[in-house]
From Swiss-Prot:
Belongs to the TfdA dioxygenase family. It comes from Erwinia amylovora (strain CFBP1430). Its cofactor is Fe(2+). One of its GO terms (molecular function) is gamma-butyrobetaine dioxygenase activity. This is Tyrosine isonitrile desaturase. Fe cation binds at residues 110, 112, 259.
């Protein structure tokens, strides 16, 4: 795709944050006329946009009528990271959920694949049906390299000493991970934050939380670590909450962003599809704690 052609065919603008100001990351792309399909856009161009902007929202395009159609498209974007259930995770509220992912609860900030042998580079999301504007369910994103830029030297020094240890058991895995708070992007070498945010400790309704501990710092520094991380990662300069519209298609960089979800109204009909795309080459998860 020739960038010179973009003004006549596509409307490209920065994402807008809570303050009404443009976000420091992310772009919104809309077609200038109806009837244009997502599959008509250059995959090479879209990948380059994710590298440059971390988060790309496509809105107003014709999209995929089924999970099979979505899977075929995603395979052109890169090698799909397959799960026992297949390529596509249907993110819908379950009647009797056994995990917070399938409840209507909030989801704390985290990165995908943190408990698996390989970590996906990209997430592709399709919004099959959006919750109402006042029903919650926004997907939240935090740019960790931007967070590192705005952190004070004292806070950054604290983060540099700390590491998190997380354990989680679900139907598909039961693993332990130990990751430094400040790590290095496994393909591009710039610093990023790897942090799995604990849920609200007073929320007894949160289903199947991970277990958390933090090392490398003094015990009396742990509260400062968590407070500074949660405050900085939600600073409007580095944070974006996406209000879904039916048909939205979102591409995100799993290696430099953290993401989560806001609580949404019970029985709202919120339905997303998610596909993971491997890195080139595949990214081994060196944070897994291997049993001897």
């Amino acid at each position: 795709m020739n960038p010179a052609d973009l003004p006549d065919t596509l409307d490209v603008a920065p994402l807008t944050g809570e303050t009404g100001e443009p976000c420091s990351f992310g772009i919104l792309i809309k077609p200038c006329r109806a009837g244009r399909h997502i599959g008509e856009l250059s995959v090479t161009w879209l990948r380059a946009l994710v590298y440059s902007h971390q988060l790309v929202v496509l809105r107003g395009f014709d999209h995929f009528a089924s999970s099979d159609s979505l899977t075929r498209y995603c395979a052109t974007f890169g090698e799909i990271m397959m799960w026992p259930y297949g390529a596509v995770l249907e993110l819908v509220e379950h009647a009797n959920p056994d995990d917070h992912i399938f409840a209507n609860s909030y989801v704390p900030l985290h990165w995908d694949g943190m408990y698996l042998d390989t970590v996906p580079e990209f997430q592709l999301f399709q919004c099959v049906h959006a919750a109402g504007d006042m029903q919650g369910g926004r997907t939240t994103f935090s740019s960790t390299n931007a967070a590192l830029r705005i952190a004070t030297p004292a806070v950054r020094e604290l983060w540099a000493r700390a590491h998190g240890r997380y354990q989680r058991s679900v139907e598909l895995y039961s693993n332990t991970v130990e990751a430094p708070i400040i790590g290095i992007h496994p393909l591009r070498e710039f610093p990023v934050i790897r942090f799995c945010e604990p849920p609200d400790e007073n929320d007894a309704t949160f289903l199947n939380p991970s277990s958390y501990s933090f090392g490398g710092i003094n015990k009396d520094e742990e509260e400062m670590l968590l407070v500074s991380l949660m405050k900085t990662l939600r600073d409007p300069r580095v944070y974006y909450a996406h209000q879904w519209q039916t048909g939205d298609f979102v591409l995100s960089d799993n290696l430099s962003l953290l993401h989560g979800r806001e609580q949404y109204t019970h029985h709202s009909g919120r339905h997303l599809r998610r596909v993971h795309i491997h890195g080139r080459p595949q990214i081994a998860n060196h944070h897994l704690v291997r049993s001897e």
